[in-house]
């Protein structure tokens, strides 16, 4: 505290201490939040954060593979150090004040030889072009871990099963 106050004086900034926040008998910390996310406990993560866990970003062009299998996606690139969770999730997305349900894959897309982390979101009943626009993705339920499939046909079949389950979970 003394070092912080001293630096605050040097840089003409106000420094104050805050009390430790306790939730369910344990200290709230970034480690505890990450652990909740890794366990896909989004309710606990939201309680610890004081808001839902949301990933926000601008939609970028991908390789358009989703369109070829009738599952177009909005892609958000993720810096490697930001990949706090991975897998397939039922999600809720906010775009221009409207809420949409969907399914998302957070990871590297091993079936198609992906290397860079990306968040791919397929929104149900949505066809708009939103490249360059911001969306907010709220993770609701984990459906499964990301995995490499033997072929694109097997991936497509699994995606349809994932979509069906996500729709049930989001009702």
Enumerate the predicted regions with their spans.
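Anionic-ligand-binding alpha/beta catalytic cores of soluble enzymes and soluble regulatory domains
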Residues: 21-22, 26-70
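Single conserved hydrophobic/aromatic residue that forms the stacking wall/gate
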Residues: 1-11
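Short glycine/serine/threonine/alanine-rich loop segments
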Residues: 13, 51, 91
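Phosphate/ribose-recognition catalytic cores of enzymes acting on nucleotide-derived substrates
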Residues: 61-171
């Amino acid at each position: 505290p003394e070092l912080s106050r001293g630096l605050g004086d040097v840089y003409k900034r106000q420094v104050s201490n805050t009390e430790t926040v306790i939730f369910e008998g344990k200290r709230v910390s970034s480690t505890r939040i990450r652990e909740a996310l890794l366990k896909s406990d989004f309710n606990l993560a939201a309680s610890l954060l004081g808001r839902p866990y949301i990933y926000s970003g601008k939609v970028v062009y991908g390789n358009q593979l989703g369109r070829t299998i009738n599952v177009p996606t909005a892609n958000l690139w993720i810096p490697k150090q930001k990949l706090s969770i991975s897998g397939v999730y039922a999600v809720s997305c906010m775009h221009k004040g409207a809420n949409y349900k969907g399914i998302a894959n957070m990871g590297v897309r091993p079936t198609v030889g992906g290397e860079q982390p990306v968040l791919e979101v397929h929104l149900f009943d949505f066809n708009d072009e939103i490249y360059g626009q911001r969306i907010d993705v709220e993770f609701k339920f984990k459906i499964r871990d990301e995995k490499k499939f033997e072929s694109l046909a097997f991936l497509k079949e699994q995606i349809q099963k994932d979509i069906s389950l996500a729709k049930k979970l989001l009702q």
